């Protein structure tokens, strides 16, 4: 389906979703949101896709919500359409925790890993979206800010829950209350990002690492481990332990387990089926 504000590509078992408003530093709009959700759902359904990458066109990842919308709300007030968009999420999914069915937390409920390839400025809502990705890989030029307090806003869309769990409570409060800007080096120290790569050739480097992830480990294991980790955030140790036993028994009966042992013993590259 033709898109207006995103680009969707699949290559080497990696689906890349590119936010495509480079002249606006990929500021977030209702159209972009709908297209990203559709692309993510398509990638999740596609058996040829094992890893999802979310990135931005041009020199930015996402500059947050489009300022024309914020300006309109500031001068004209909230209307029903804006209020509906604030509350909107995807269609309910049976068997999936409500925590993983909100507007952006739906990324956590996907079976496939989502990598934020942060190629430049990432602020406000853009940072919220990056937090809900499983891995955050940044270019040296990336800059980050929560921004909300500088706009008279609050920690939006669950950021007050996610950010402390990623960087710790003291640093989360620092970033939220001050809304200060940090560079990629400090973001790495804070563990806001997992890795920092050179700016030159960033997109190609990210694709190379994503392909490595897609080809070297079991997609079944990726999905189960991801679910274990995020579900574990709401469990006791005993509950997490018991779930791991159930999943261990299932994994020992899987085709990917047999292939995992076989490729190691035969000293060859794995050919995982995801089953």
Segments predicted by a language model, with ranges:
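C-terminal long alpha-helix characteristic of the crotonase
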Residues: 22, 137-142, 193-242, 255, ...
């Amino acid at each position: 389906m033709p898109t207006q504000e995103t680009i969707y590509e699949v290559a080497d078992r990696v689906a890349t979703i590119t936010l495509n408003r480079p002249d606006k530093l990929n500021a977030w709009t209702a159209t972009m949101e709908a297209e990203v959700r559709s692309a993510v759902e398509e990638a999740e359904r596609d058996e040829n896709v094992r890893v999802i990458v979310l990135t931005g066109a041009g020199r930015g990842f996402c500059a947050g919500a489009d300022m024309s919308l914020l300006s309109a709300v500031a001068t004209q007030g909230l209307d029903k359409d804006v209020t509906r968009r604030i509350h909107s999420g995807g269609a309910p999914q049976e068997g999936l925790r409500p925590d993983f069915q909100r507007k952006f937390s739906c990324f956590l409920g996907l079976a496939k890993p989502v990598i934020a390839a942060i190629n430049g400025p990432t602020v406000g809502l853009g940072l919220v979206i990056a937090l809900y990705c499983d891995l955050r890989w940044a270019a040296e030029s990336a800059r980050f800010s929560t921004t909300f307090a500088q706009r008279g806003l609050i920690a939006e869309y669950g950021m007050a829950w996610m950010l402390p769990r990623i960087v710790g409570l003291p640093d989360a409060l620092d970033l939220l209350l001050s809304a200060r800007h940090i560079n990629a080096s400090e973001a790495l120290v804070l563990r806001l990002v997992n890795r920092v790569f050179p700016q030159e050739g960033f997109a190609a480097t990210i694709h190379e690492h994503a392909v490595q992830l897609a080809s070297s480990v079991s997609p079944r294991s990726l999905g189960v481990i991801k679910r274990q980790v995020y579900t574990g955030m709401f469990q006791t140790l005993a509950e997490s332990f018991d779930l791991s036993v159930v999943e261990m028994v299932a994994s020992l009966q899987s085709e990917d387990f047999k292939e995992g042992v076989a490729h190691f013993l035969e000293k060859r590259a794995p050919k995982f089926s995801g089953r």
